[in-house]
Amino acid sequence: MLSFVDNRILLLLAVTSLLASCQSGGLKGPRGAKGPRGDRGPQGPNGRDGKAGLPGIAGPPGPPGLGGNFAAQFDGGKGSDPGPGPMGLMGSRGPNGPPGAPGPQGFTGHAGEPGEPGQTGSIGARGPTGSAGKPGEDGNNGRPGKPGDRGGPGTQGARGFPGTPGLPGMKGHRGYNGLDGRKGESGTAGAKGETGAHGANGSPGPAGSRGLNGERGRAGPAGPAGARGADGSTGPAGPAGPLGAAGPPGFPGAPGPKGEIGGAGSNGPSGPQGGRGEPGINGAVGPVGPVGNPGNNGINGAKGAAGLPGVAGAPGFPGPRGGPGPQGPQGSTGARGLGGDPGPSGQKGDSGAKGEPGHSGVQGAAGPAGEEGKRGSTGEVGATGPAGLRGARGGAGTRGLPGLEGRGGPIGMPGARGATGPGGIRGAPGDAGRAGESGLTGARGLPGNSGQGGPPGKEGPPGAAGLDGRTGPPGPTGPRGQPGNIGFPGPKGPGGEAGKGGDKGPTGATGLRGGPGADGNNGAPGPAGVVGNTGEKGEQGPAGAPGFQGLPGPAGPAGEAGKAGNQGMPGDQGLPGPAGVKGERGNSGPAGSAGSQGAIGARGPAGTPGPDGGKGEPGSVGIVGAAGHQGPGGMPGERGAGGTPGPKGEKGEGGHRGLEGNMGRDGARGGPGPSGPPGPSGANGEKGESGSFGPAGPAGLRGPSGERGEGGPAGLPGFAGPPGSDGQSGPRGEKGPAGGKGDVGPAGPAGPSGQSGPSGASGPAGPPGGRGDAGPSGLTGFPGAAGRVGGPGPAGIAGPPGSAGPAGKDGPRGLRGDPGPGGPQGEQGVVGPAGISGDKGPSGESGPPGAPGTAGPQGVLGPSGFVGLPGSRGDKGLPGGPGAVGEPGRLGPAGASGPRGPAGNIGMPGMTGTQGEAGREGNSGNDGPPGRPGAAGFKGDRGEPGSPGALGSSGQPGPNGPAGSAGRPGNRGESGPTGNGGPVGAVGARGAPGPAGPRGEKGGAGEKGDRGMKGLRGHGGLQGMPGPNGPSGETGSAGITGPAGPRGPAGPHGPPGKDGRAGGHGAIGPVGHRGSPGHLGPAGPPGSPGLPGPAGPAGGGYDQSGGYDEYRADQPSFRAKDYEVDATIKSLNSQIENLLTPEGSKKNPARTCRDIRLSHPDWSSGFYWIDPNQGCIADAIKAYCDFSTGHTCIHPHPESIARKNWYRSSENKKHVWFGETINGGTEFAYNDETLSPQSMATQLAFMRLLANQATQNITYHCKNSVAYMDGENGNLKKAVLLQGSNDVELRAEGNSRFTFNVLEDGCTRHTGQWSKTVIEYRTNKPSRLPILDIAPLDIGEADQEFGLDIGPVCFK
């Protein structure tokens, strides 16, 4: 029999397990499907004691007890009445007495549980034959029989209905031409047809009378170079010509004396973003910055390595029952059990997870190149992957299209100064940009090289006297230096103005007839004619004879532009027509190609001296004469024509700082700058409206010419530039060969035989079968309906020409014919008198580009091109190495129940117990032995990405793919080096002048002569007017990044970012320290009494005659005194009942209001005690339980803030936090007066964990203060701010997750009356509530007052 203490322990264990099951209450899930039949449970607990048997016969006396020492307990001096002594200690238990006599027959017990099935008996004798059964159900259809013999021929059937018309037949061959039909009658006049296409140009008409003078035509492009005229006699020396084009660089002079140190220039404007510099050296570790605001959730980190095993802790107390353990190892196959009852049909399982990828198949033959796919939409930016190993440098990709201009990135850290990059290849001239504002005068550049001597110019009129310049100090004359290396090209000069139009040259020989010109401009649309009635179409009449040339009709409306015709074959040279009257100067035609070199004619007799010839070819270079004295300054020459742009010069020194220009476009994105220390939390300023750009400032006055500086020494070569940025992905690689066939894996263990499943649902209809064989011809069908009208047949061959028709009406005026061939060259006319000087004409348009010059010297390597667009997707690469083993998948579902075990031995029949009361549902039994392995679990969630595998070895090169389509034209190659000039020939002697012969035909253009030697430097001309803007030069190389500016003030707090995506599961943390041992749990409930043992022998050695009968257990009659045990059990029962069904009282609090509502569904809403963190009930809190909504509401303390003028300030209005600033740093409190703030914070933290929704209201009482909507301005800029529990600010507008709603808005205007605005915030993130503070904006004046009512925070 169990003792009283044992019973209490059992009771307390039951209470503990009940507690554990009570606390783990989540939302009740849906009812699961009926599980398979379980194995037989373990033997149940023994029944209660039967009723006491009758007393047995007294046993024999027991052995004598141990003698006690009573000497110390007696006083020898007293011999009077010895009353009963004190009760001695209970002796040790005597040995078991012999069995008593059997008791009387007990009452018949209740029927026991069915015993285990007995072993199968032997097969009985065969029974008698049974009576005939009922007829069975129809069997399944038998298999089809064998085909029967072929029957005899049937009788002739009746004639069938006509068949439907057949499909149209194939198109027939073209028929022969039919005979000409007879001429039809003339049809009625048709409507006016649409204007036909322009006809071919007619033959030239007779020369018309001279027309009126047209408007002056635009200057035509320059004609081809005329033949070289005869050498004229030497003219008088002209004045100094204009400054010639820059010649090749001269030898560098010797270094001049060092100039004086100039004044410090002002800071120049920020240069363009520099190239990315080399990584700088890691700086020293800075001081620890202040704690920044919490960042967004980071991306999932890789799984950490397992930690070292910790020190073994002390053995813990028994924990609550754990969840199902992982699948155990496969047990050995048990003996086959008896067949179980058939289970119910299972529900259709979910579709299985996608299988693992199969092994790579054998490489197929290369398929044909697919069509180019559409460009996919831009994908979202992926998470930043781990940095891979640095790959080998790829080949240069094709130049991609320029991308869209990116937004300006933050200014990066100043990089180390890069070396001067090599000059790029000269680009094509861009369109002329708008005229820029005049910059400040730059520092004077290095002197340019001497230009070639220009041709002698005409003597110009004397210019106005210039202003006296400042006299510069004479510099010392340096010694003549050795010739230096050829310098870098000088800077590109400005484009000169277009020169004046030259005199009209003689008429050239008639060229070959050119191809058809481009379509002319459309003429003005003529008036639309009246539309006549549409006549019926007559048969085509024969073509009439050509009519006479009609008068020109009005111009028809412009037809649509026809496609450009193919290039016509050149026609034969026409006979020269008679010379026409000299017409007005026509528009300049395009320049003709140069004619071939004519044969050299015989030398004619010496002619009379001709007029002055053009500029002769430069003569050979004479010996360099001694330097002459400085001559007096010549007269200023006329303004010279603009020189050709010089080559690009070296980068000049930085000029003085110019005026600040307009904001430039966003620069290229810089590298990330260093993290600055977090600035102070500024208040949100109101966003100002964007200001418009100011008007451009007036052009500055031209500064005076600087003095000529001394030539500086050549600079050292710069450092090598930084490596270019990595190119984008190269084109898709060819498909690698298939991987080798993997080894065959070991055979898996045979799974257990599954039970036959239920019939599957009907499958979907299969795809349509292939086309069947043609059936036998059907009977003749009914005649079909008439077919639709067929499409027009192909055009017949053109018939023979018809007879001439009547003359047509006058046609419209023909287009202007091509110009007739030029007449023969007229004789040279007499020189006319000089005309009056005309007004200066307007500047002509830019002439056509000149012939390409000789190739310049090879340029230095240009900078890296832009990163091209991503290449097309590469073919599938080789299979990657095996990935890292993923994390274990989620626990699979429980396996199917194992086969039923063999029958156990039949137990002994138990004693019949009395019928007990129906017990409560027992606790779950201990875990049974591991079941057979379950079926494979569903595929687990994808594991975290493994760490990058080591770089695989390069695969074998794949087979050559099919030839790709032709690539785009390559970039223009670099210009080849200039060839050496040939030697100068000797100058021949001048022959005697002969008589002037007749003027010869114009010779072909001579070949271009070798470049002449450099002429002597002419006198400097006057400063020319500023030329027009030259074409935009190429973008200069990026300047050095300027030093970082001073740290700007901290920007305003940005709006809270959106919640980041939920991070992945973090790696398992290290083992924590062992917790302190928990408190001793309450004693468990007493166990059920055991079976009564046999009666022991009677004790001996104690004289019972003294009347000591206090041991109630010695005799059954004393069992009436068990009321203490009964009371204890009753008390425990009531405590367990309270745990199972909490009352919400101070002594029996519930965890949440939900527990009270589930335990007592008929109770009404009100205040109850709850203890969210469980444990000791001393920290229970009082909450309002709203059973209608399921909310647990905790009230603030205090619940209202007095209405008065809380804040006076004359500064600009800003949000002022009530608890932090106005109320002396006291936030809204939610603790009970009897609890410490720490205990309340703990309870609130558990409350947030137990809830998944939260809501709270705040009422803002106002007087002349706006709380939400500003009624005057119609915006929310004066709305209050709220502070949540996790320091998040809740606003009136912005991110919807952090905005509150308004249920009533009475505080919109300053009315002088009290009103209120009720604010509500609901969220699925309970961690944001309760509200701890409020910040009004529209306060601070003497008449502005407010107060608050803080509503309870309610969790659900």
Curated annotation (Swiss-Prot):
Propeptide residues, chain positions: 23-72, 1114-1356
For this protein, the record's Pfam families field holds: COLFI, Collagen
Alphabetized SMART domains for the sequence = COLFI (SM00038)
Q: Where does Ca(2+) bind?
A: D1171, N1173, Q1174, C1176, D1179
What are the GO cellular component annotations? collagen trimer; extracellular region
Q: InterPro entries, alphabetically?
A: Collagen, Collagen_Structural_Proteins, Fib_collagen_C
The places in or outside the cell where this protein is found are:
Secreted, Extracellular space, Extracellular matrix
> Per the annotation, which location comes first and is thus the protein's main one?
secreted
List every stretch annotated Disordered: 22-1112
Q: Hydrolase among the record's keywords?
A: no
Q: Where is the composition biased (Pro residues)?
A: 317-327, 1083-1095
Highest taxon of the lineage: Eukaryota
Q: Does the keyword Chaperone apply?
A: no
| Sites where a glycan is attached | K171, N1257
Q: Which residues carry this modification: Pyrrolidone carboxylic acid?
A: Q23, Q73
Q: How is it modified after translation?
A: Prolines at the third position of the tripeptide repeating unit (G-X-Y) are hydroxylated in some or all of the chains.
One GO molecular-function entry = metal ion binding
Where the record annotates domain Fibrillar collagen NC1, the positions are 1123-1356
Record-listed 5-hydroxylysine modification sites: K171
* Record field: compositional bias (Gly residues): 76-88, 259-280, 334-343, 391-412, 418-427, 448-457, 511-520, 610-619, 628-646, 736-745, 787-796, 817-826, 877-886, 976-985
State where composition is biased (Basic and acidic residues).
648-659, 999-1013
Renumbered to this chain, the Low complexity biased-composition regions fall at 219-248, 281-315, 479-489, 521-564, 587-603, 716-731, 746-764, 776-786, 797-809, 827-858, 888-903
Q: What is known of its domains?
A: The C-terminal propeptide, also known as COLFI domain, have crucial roles in tissue growth and repair by controlling both the intracellular assembly of procollagen molecules and the extracellular assembly of collagen fibrils. It binds a calcium ion which is essential for its function.
Q: What is the protein's quaternary organization?
A: Trimers of one alpha 2(I) and two alpha 1(I) chains.
**Physiological role:** Type I collagen is a member of group I collagen (fibrillar forming collagen).
What's this protein's name?
Answer: Collagen alpha-2(I) chain
Report the source organism.
Oncorhynchus mykiss (Rainbow trout)
Lineage, uppermost ranks: Eukaryota, Metazoa, Chordata, Craniata, Vertebrata
